[in-house]
């Protein structure tokens, strides 16, 4: 296990104090952790301030913490919130770094091999490395992660053993230092870029793999290190000095030489065994021999090869079938695990392993990979549970598993700081539901800034309703999984800005929608039993209207299903608690005021590129600078879809500038 070395305290910064149910929830959760309770549930209604409660608990127990979210969007939201709560501490972000990923596969029936194809997001790679660096260095580390935390990465022992500590006044032969940096996956480069270094006379500049705001300048007299400075990576202006520094590797897959040599030996042994297995199958034999020996040569020469993760077991020394090392192994034993939206996250944990193994079966069976590739995988659910020493499950609708594992340690957080109670759903006949819905929509359109969410049972119905409303002059659109992430973000922004009044979708829970303007949630065909009409889903849908003081929920159904009955009883129970609290404390519900962050890209890339062709060289240079600044700003704010668009526009502007300069030179 990795262990922190610096013992800073978590320092909570908040412009408000806990209120409502929060103080009691914070006290009980904190006490439970202190008392060694292995699992607790925070059952908090939508809008009750669960993240703020979590932040207070983290500050109280003061141990390294992992917050697990079920998708990247939610992880980014949580990261930004915790970053604001803990500006003095190491709040980190760990998600999949693939912008695009096509896994390696073989389809036997058509003899089709699909090579792995991927595009790594450089900014997210930096954040992942920053996360592991922090958890190894300091105790006041909070990492917000997606399900990526259960996927194999390099061993924390290998990673930390390859870290390089330098001290002013000591001697470091320059050639050996350069070689060590290369082994740490830093490349020699004359231009400043992440995971690189450059030598100029007595100075070595190192552009860290896990930092974008600071680079390191080492100054030598002969081989004696006389100065360590942190500098701005763009201007190279010094920021501050230090007497010592620990540099961490540029990859999680770095290995010491002895480990690498041992891995090469065991890979060869496995290859020999597999060649015997494929006796009489010359195609598979030759394929596996060529591929594996090429990989071995690459590992010998540069310590790395394409697809090195498929040999990870050989580098960690694990036996076949043993769990892979993952982010969880970088944490000390006493860490706190918070699983947000646990009713969705836990099923995800269960599903990851099965899909991974079925794909690799053909690759191993037909000689594309050694059997050890099976061990480059996510943890199984049972393996992941071994890390659940101190866990808090957080959900408005926890599942049976969380309830069972918490053994009665369930802490409710029902009261909202705004005083807004849960809306009590109305049940109306499914027959004529569209006509009734239309009248409800028209009533809200007469008011200012009131929006409507409509939950349908199919994508086709969502599209048809949106088209029907649009024909009547109502600003409506649909939202479902067939729409790309960037467009979904723009649709939600347009709803808040008033460009859209009605949003129709199938599973609007997955979008992480937090829209205080929504005053009506209409659930069509609420009596159609299924995953999206379960009691948990219905309660979650109702919560979408609980951020508006005029919030209303209508369920269109011809009968009351068991799921609907449970939803109605639970909503009524919560609503009574909330109203009694408001009356007792003389609280008047207040509307939520949430700033609207408009999508900065309002034109299609094609239109922008057409406009670029009409610009002069000087204007193009200005556009390049503008797009570059916007790209970095979007990346820092975790708006990666926007960052990619700005990057593409910047590259288009650069291409156009080169074209224009070429024409100018030819004209001369």
Curated annotation (Swiss-Prot):
CDD domains according to UniProt: DEXHc_UvrB (cd17916), SF2_C_UvrB (cd18790)
SUPFAM superfamilies reported for this sequence: C-terminal UvrC-binding domain of UvrB, P-loop containing nucleoside triphosphate hydrolases
Domain Helicase ATP-binding: 31-416
Subcellular location: Cytoplasm
GO molecular function: ATP binding; ATP hydrolysis activity; DNA binding; excinuclease ABC activity
Pfam families referenced in this protein's UniProt entry, alphabetically: Helicase_C (PF00271), ResIII (PF04851), UVR (PF02151), UvrB (PF12344), UvrB_inter (PF17757)
Domain UVR as annotated: residue spans: 621-656
Motif Beta-hairpin per record, residues: 97-120
One Gene Ontology biological process: nucleotide-excision repair
Keywords, sorted A to Z: ATP-binding, Cytoplasm, DNA damage, DNA excision, DNA repair, Excision nuclease, Nucleotide-binding, SOS response
Main location: cytoplasm
Residue ranges constituting the Helicase C-terminal domain according to the UniProt record: 433-596
Residues reported to bind ATP: 44-51
Segments traversing the membrane: none
GO cellular component, one term: excinuclease repair complex
Family, similarity comment: Belongs to the UvrB family.
Free-text comment about domains: The beta-hairpin motif is involved in DNA binding.
Assembly notes: Forms a heterotetramer with UvrA during the search for lesions. Interacts with UvrC in an incision complex.
Role noted for this protein: The UvrABC repair system catalyzes the recognition and processing of DNA lesions. A damage recognition complex composed of 2 UvrA and 2 UvrB subunits scans DNA for abnormalities. Upon binding of the UvrA(2)B(2) complex to a putative damaged site, the DNA wraps around one UvrB monomer. DNA wrap is dependent on ATP binding by UvrB and probably causes local melting of the DNA helix, facilitating insertion of UvrB beta-hairpin between the DNA strands. Then UvrB probes one DNA strand for the presence of a lesion.
Protein name per its UniProtKB record: UvrABC system protein B
Species of origin: Chlamydia trachomatis serovar A (strain ATCC VR-571B / DSM 19440 / HAR-13)
Gene that produces this protein: uvrB
